[in-house]
Amino acid sequence: TGESFTQLTDFARDLGKTTMMSAQESAEAMSFLGMAGWDTTQIMAGLPNILNLTVASGRDFATVADIVSDNLTAFGMSADESGRYTDALAYAMSNANVNMDTLGESLKYIAPVASSAGFSMEETVSAVMALGDAGIKGSQAGTTLRTVMLNLTGANEKATAKLKELGVEIFDSSGKTRSFNAIIKDLEKALDGMTDAQKTATLNTIVGKTAISGFSTLVNQGADKLNEYTKGIRNSSGATQEMADTMG
């Protein structure tokens, strides 16, 4: 509408004055988000966060906007929550061996599955961080976590039987998926006392040979590391702005 166009034009002009992007670049950014299906209110709520993440990551706006808009949808999050998401990504880049490209590639594979399986965005990003620290990044991290989360939540009969045998509960009494980190913690306890060969065989039964390397890494690093990262993400409000200020 005419009113929306005026709002966005004024907003682009303001961003041109208050950010490193020109009014023209801001307008192009808005057009991109509009094509992604965002309305005027969503664009005005989310754009400043994406602009900051663009500066913080050193990547081009189109790449960052594509990653953020796609992943928000995949995680079932709204544009109003874009700040929470960009802060999570900024925290990840500052604290683990990952960057914008590897994060985007990983989350493309795992975000839809994590959301439908009932695992939180924060725990999912934490798992990607932990894998990145071990040199497992991008699509390899994404496909590994996709297999892990699917098999943990019942996609594979052998995995379900093995988890039951180990006494590892995936769902709580109300049928809701338990915390990913809590499940990893219980797996750690269940594997305690086994030989390395027994641990490998057990984890292989749960996730299969293509995901065993990454899954073993997560379990060996332990839930404490995942919890540390998850806590950091949950307390990361303002991380995007802070990182953009540093990089800018």
Language model region names:
Residues P48-F75:
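Carboxylate/His-rich catalytic cores and anion/metal-binding grooves
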Residues E25, A29, T63-A65, A141-L145, ...:
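Gly/Ala-rich hydrophobic membrane-inserting helices
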Residues T1, G16, L72, A79-L152, ...:
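Amphipathic/coiled-coil alpha-helical interface segments used
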